[in-house]
Amino acid sequence: MNILKISKQTLRNNIKIIREYIGNAKMCFPVKANAYGHGIEDIVENTHDLVDFFAVANSLEAFRVTAVAKNPVLVFGVIYYEYIEKMISENIRVSIQDYEDIEKLEQIAKELDKKVYAHININTGMNRMGVDYNDACRTIQRAYESDWLILEGVYSHLACADNRDHPTNIKQKNRFDSIVKFTKGLSQDIICHLSNSYGFLGQKGICYDMVRPGILSYGFLPEFYVDRVIREIKPIARLLSKVVKIITLQEGEGVGYSLIYRGFEGEQLAVIPIGYGDGFPRELGDRGFVNINDVMYPMAGRMSMDSLTVSLGINEYDVKVGDTVELISAIPRNRNSAFSIAKQTNTIEYDIMSTLNDRIIRKII
């Protein structure tokens, strides 16, 4: 059995640290992609009293949030109109991505005789989603004047927040400042938000009315310098499994597909029942590390869909079937932390955590 153990205390402490750091700004907690792999229902249930909003990528994720909490939920992605009636009935906040969305939403709202809560996503330089910057003011004005829309927020997203000195950050901030000025001229109550985790850490002055700290809430810090108080934030989860079999190699034998790992006579291998079918990175095979009884052991051979093997050498520490295996550590400096695994596999911590799938049990402790 593979379990992602999540520390409720660490999670809540992370959020409290962030809230203190951002001052009076509201906190919108992103829980998309199954709460970055941590389990959306459990995360929402244990944080709803600490945050102002939750944010997700699509309608189906939003329904999972509203099933366990009453906080406002913002959907970042495009509007799936097949779900729009339920979204409106549950007061889920939609993101207007194009001027044309306004008329479509108005027509549906009229039919339901219920207003739609909306945030307008403005493309200030990410060039992925959102209303074109040059059309922003017209779209904001139109939505604000609508009898069927409640324009609750206006937002954008930073493209290069992980590089605090990138010139695009200033360009996007300047553009967003002009949008904020126009928006606040209509109403001071409209929530303006730009910053993800690395955005407000790189430049505290861009918190505006609300911030969206996703990866930071789960305990992952940027590589650039941040204030000492932020350094108290810790990863909230450990991925654990068990040794299910010990194998002793004979002379000339190997292990796994294509037998790319060739051991020595008498070498012992531990079989762990987790693989890329669980969302664990296949690239770790033959180069990753696991922790068994406070000793690091290297993976041996290719990772399979449902299992991996590690070399115990001569097994001088007497690893046994049933021993606990730590696959992902909550200590960033460890060789099996999400940070270290991301470096080994040329990716980011978001990827390592969010791809862990539902074959892995989530447990809040």
Curated annotation (Swiss-Prot):
<dbReference type="Pfam" id="PF01168">
    <property type="entry name" value="Ala_racemase_N"/>
</dbReference>
<comment type="function">
    <text>Catalyzes the interconversion of L-alanine and D-alanine. May also act on other amino acids.</text>
</comment>
<dbReference type="InterPro" id="IPR011079">
    <property type="entry name" value="Ala_racemase_C"/>
</dbReference>
<keyword id="KW-0413">Isomerase</keyword>
<dbReference type="Pfam" id="PF00842">
    <property type="entry name" value="Ala_racemase_C"/>
</dbReference>
<dbReference type="InterPro" id="IPR001608">
    <property type="entry name" value="Ala_racemase_N"/>
</dbReference>
<dbReference type="GO" id="GO:0030632">
    <property type="term" value="P:D-alanine biosynthetic process"/>
</dbReference>
<dbReference type="InterPro" id="IPR029066">
    <property type="entry name" value="PLP-binding_barrel"/>
</dbReference>
<dbReference type="InterPro" id="IPR000821">
    <property type="entry name" value="Ala_racemase"/>
</dbReference>
<feature type="active site" description="Proton acceptor; specific for D-alanine">
    <location>
        <position position="32"/>
    </location>
</feature>
<dbReference type="InterPro" id="IPR009006">
    <property type="entry name" value="Ala_racemase/Decarboxylase_C"/>
</dbReference>
<dbReference type="GO" id="GO:0005829">
    <property type="term" value="C:cytosol"/>
</dbReference>
<feature type="binding site">
    <location>
        <position position="128"/>
    </location>
    <ligand>
        <name>substrate</name>
    </ligand>
</feature>
<protein>
    <recommendedName>
        <fullName>Alanine racemase</fullName>
        <ecNumber>5.1.1.1</ecNumber>
    </recommendedName>
</protein>
<feature type="active site" description="Proton acceptor; specific for L-alanine">
    <location>
        <position position="257"/>
    </location>
</feature>
<feature type="modified residue" description="N6-(pyridoxal phosphate)lysine">
    <location>
        <position position="32"/>
    </location>
</feature>
<comment type="similarity">
    <text>Belongs to the alanine racemase family.</text>
</comment>
<feature type="binding site">
    <location>
        <position position="305"/>
    </location>
    <ligand>
        <name>substrate</name>
    </ligand>
</feature>
<dbReference type="GO" id="GO:0008784">
    <property type="term" value="F:alanine racemase activity"/>
</dbReference>
<comment type="pathway">
    <text>Amino-acid biosynthesis; D-alanine biosynthesis; D-alanine from L-alanine: step 1/1.</text>
</comment>
<keyword id="KW-0663">Pyridoxal phosphate</keyword>
<dbReference type="GO" id="GO:0030170">
    <property type="term" value="F:pyridoxal phosphate binding"/>
</dbReference>
